[in-house]
């Protein structure tokens, strides 16, 4: 682990000071420890919601000689988590180095292939099924790897599991901070994504079990869910992009910029083309828009286990461990 020594040094200082113990879940969790091996650093880094408040409150932050910068340190450790626990690991490293370029090129190439192929909406079903299987396996492997290193061997009480799930779904530790809109945009993005997934699932049910082919009526469940989810994703990702570009450079890890922008760009493009497809589904533009949309969705799927999406899974796991410790 590249930042193990620096992490242990900074947390020893923070453990002696404890001025920030009321800011979030990280500092009470830190106070329950006297040593900080790599597994504990992975846990604390993913428990952090990156609000940055501790940096502005810290009397030992740069230019002090102690140079305590917890937000930046934990951001760097989180990136190590993404790489260390990803499967396959080589793809995670490649995506980290040029995330935006990889994401855009992948979407463009897949869209071009789909345009060149026979224009049958259902021709790509097998391809998407294979991609979905890969995503489920890769994310599951990553979650298991993370829990083995940064989790706990204690049993998981039902109350602790429910509390951890609630903290994750409500973004409890994004409720404070100088930019409250960050929590709102995260909610719009996360729940927009879930609504789009629900729309796809309902559409699959209608097609395979009810034998109803797309396009579906405007007031049908797939269209309503997809429209609401797409709008949420569009606004949420645009807001997160603005906040990302405005974020104080002193507390962010520049090495993650490509990965972050790649993920945001794919989410935004997926929602934008999905809404455009709805509006143009009875025009001659529909096949081209459909190809771009399917290309964006497939590119998003293929990069989910190797990019910023995994931060939600590891953070939920860290919140679960925190809930177990509190009980």
List the predicted regions and their residue ranges.
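Secondary-structure capping and boundary motifs in well-ordered enzyme cores
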Residues: 16, 40-51, 227-230, 257-264
């Amino acid at each position: 682990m590249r930042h193990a020594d620096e992490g242990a040094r900074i947390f020893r200082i923070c453990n002696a000071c404890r001025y920030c113990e009321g800011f979030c879940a990280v500092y009470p969790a830190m106070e329950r420890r006297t040593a900080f091996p790599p597994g504990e650093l992975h846990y604390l880094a993913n428990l952090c919601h990156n609000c940055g408040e501790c940096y502005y409150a810290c009397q030992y932050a740069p230019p002090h000689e102690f140079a305590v910068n917890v937000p930046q340190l934990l951001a760097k450790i989180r990136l190590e988590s993404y790489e260390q626990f990803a499967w396959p690991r080589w793809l995670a490293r490649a995506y980290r180095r040029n995330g935006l370029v990889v994401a855009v090129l992948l979407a463009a190439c897949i869209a071009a292939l789909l345009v060149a192929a026979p224009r049958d909406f259902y021709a790509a079903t097998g391809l998407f099924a294979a991609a979905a299987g890969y995503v489920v396996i890769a994310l599951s492997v990553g979650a298991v790897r993370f829990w083995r290193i940064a989790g706990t061997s204690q049993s998981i009480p039902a109350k602790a599991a429910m509390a951890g799930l609630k903290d994750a779904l409500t973004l409890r530790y994004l409720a404070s901070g100088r930019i409250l809109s960050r929590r709102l945009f995260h909610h719009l993005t996360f729940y927009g994504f879930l609504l789009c997934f629900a729309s796809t699932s309902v559409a699959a049910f209608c097609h395979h079990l009810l034998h109803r082919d797309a396009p579906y009526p405007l007031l049908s469940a797939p269209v309503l869910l997809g429209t609401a989810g797409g709008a949420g994703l569009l606004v949420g990702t645009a807001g997160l992009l603005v906040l990302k570009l405005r974020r104080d450079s002193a507390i962010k890890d520049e090495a993650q910029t490509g990965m972050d922008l790649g993920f945001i760009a794919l989410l935004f493009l997926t929602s934008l083309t999905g809404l455009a497809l709805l509006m143009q589904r009875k025009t001659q533009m529909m096949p081209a828009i459909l190809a771009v949309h399917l290309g964006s969705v497939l590119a998003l799927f293929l990069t989910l286990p190797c990019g910023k999406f995994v931060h939600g899974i590891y953070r939920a796991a860290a919140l679960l461990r925190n809930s177990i410790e509190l009980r």
